[in-house]
Amino acid sequence: MKKYIISIDQGTTSTRAILFDQQQNILAVSQEEIHNSFPQPGWVEQDANEIWLSTLSCLSSLFLKSGAQPDEVASIGITNQRETTVVWNKKTGMPIHNAIVWQSRQTAAIVERYKKMGVEPLIKEKTGLVLDPYFSATKIRWILEEKNIQNTEDLLFGTIDTWLVWKMTNGKVHVTDVTNASRTLLLNIQNYWNCLIFLKTCFLKSSILPVLSAILIRFIFSILPVRSEPWSVINKALCLDNLVFTKEKSKTLTEPAAFY
């Protein structure tokens, strides 16, 4: 009988997982710290494999603590740090570089290059975002240039949600949702995925991108016989939780930084 729900919170400083029963009681909680590296001032990177292993460890810990069985889990919800960028080889499953974290400024020179090309107004019109190192597209470009990669045929890109689902499905599913895609500089908000102008500017092929999926979708996990229930990023999920539905209301998250 499917009687449990798991929530995964993959954040900047830690990975957490919570097991709930049908009455929304918390049966078990697990958390593991995530390490950040700082190769240069303003640069922030993480080991994408460590992120995955910490998630797997947290899930295993829930079952050990609660006595629940994987086949009793009805669904898994995922919330994650956005913008953080992973590029990996789809044949080996290995990242080609550390994940570049959302707050990293290491793509500043690339951003300035594109601003000088005069593409920022059009990109803002198409994506709703300004050109800034914060967002994922320039992080992808930085990784490819750092590794001197011209052919991206065997490569995949994902934010952390995409990376975790891809790992959970043994490479069978490469997807993301609107809440994550909207922070990549690659989502055309007028007709959704993808922003061709920036793909061309960054010399990226659309084959590297995950499929933009509806928020309600079912996946059969290879490691757990359950479905991945709608994942959403922390900020937007908190707005729903606190009934922030009008322009007069707002919600602020203050960990690990302040998000409005």
Model-derived features: positions:
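Structured, active/binding-site neighborhoods that engage oxygen-rich ligands
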Residues: 118
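Short glycine-enriched loops at secondary-structure junctions
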Residues: 23, 81-82, 105, 162-163, ...
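Short alpha-helical segments and helix-capping/turn motifs at coil-helix boundaries
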Residues: 61-65, 142-150, 236-238
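Glycine-rich phosphate-binding loop of actin/hexokinase-like ATP-binding domains
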Residues: 85-114, 154, 158-191, 220-260
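N-terminal glycine/serine-rich phosphate-binding loop of ATP-dependent small-molecule kinases
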Residues: 1-97, 109, 125, 151-154, ...
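Gly/Ser/Thr-rich active-site cleft segment
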Residues: 10-12, 123-232
